[in-house]
């Protein structure tokens, strides 16, 4: 755990960050963003260029465990490519490992071609990461530990990443209290890796205490 002095030092050494929760315009969910069938460097580059023109310097983005599980080497290469595009336009990245948000009908993601975005209808086919079934089934958490540690070890000293968000909105939707075991574990795993970057978790409205 960082001391107050470490946190203040990090704050002084870094700029004022201003950015977005990022997902490309061609992706209905984060599975589509990372999947082999739809990852689009062209769209990402266009949007990073736009972000730079607006004075933004950071992007917060959910990584999809299902895509990693299908092909870990592909996922790490793709994340590296995404980071390189962002870096080209001066945009730092806050990757997110897990996410309980499920705005659509699917609470467990599947890889492959995803539904197309619908104009004016946000996230109608959204899916969380890793999916509710794995969150509540602690027998699967060994797989998630491997995912977190492999990705974080690969990028733990990478200056293109400015913060790791370990879990976005734990307990959101139908997950009250059921996310706590995984949330506690992911902080333990991250601290075992001991990345150069700080770690955090984006709280959900109901779990601020």
Which functions belong to the PLM regions below?
Residues 2-209:
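Active-site mouth of glycoside hydrolases
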């Amino acid at each position: 755990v960082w001391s107050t002095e470490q946190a203040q030092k990090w704050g002084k050494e870094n700029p004022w960050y201003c950015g977005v929760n990022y997902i490309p315009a061609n992706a209905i969910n984060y599975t589509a963003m990372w999947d082999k069938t739809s990852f689009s460097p062209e769209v990402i580059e266009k949007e990073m260029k736009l972000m730079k023109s607006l004075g933004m310097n950071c992007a917060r983005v959910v990584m999809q465990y299902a895509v990693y599980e299908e092909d870990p080497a592909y996922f790490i290469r793709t994340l590296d490519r995404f980071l390189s595009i962002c870096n080209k336009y001066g945009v730092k990245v806050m990757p997110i490992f897990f996410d309980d948000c499920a705005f659509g009908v699917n609470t467990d993601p599947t890889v492959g071609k995803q539904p197309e975005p619908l104009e004016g209808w946000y996230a109608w086919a959204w899916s969380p990461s890793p999916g509710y079934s794995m969150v509540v089934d602690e027998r699967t958490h060994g797989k998630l530990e491997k995912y977190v540690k492999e990705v974080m070890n690969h990028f733990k000293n990478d200056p293109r990443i400015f913060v790791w968000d370990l879990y976005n909105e734990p307990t959101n939707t139908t997950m009250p209290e059921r996310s706590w075991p995984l949330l506690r574990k992911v902080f333990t795993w991250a601290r075992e890796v001991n990345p150069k970057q700080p770690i955090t978790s984006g709280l959900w409205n109901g779990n601020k205490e």
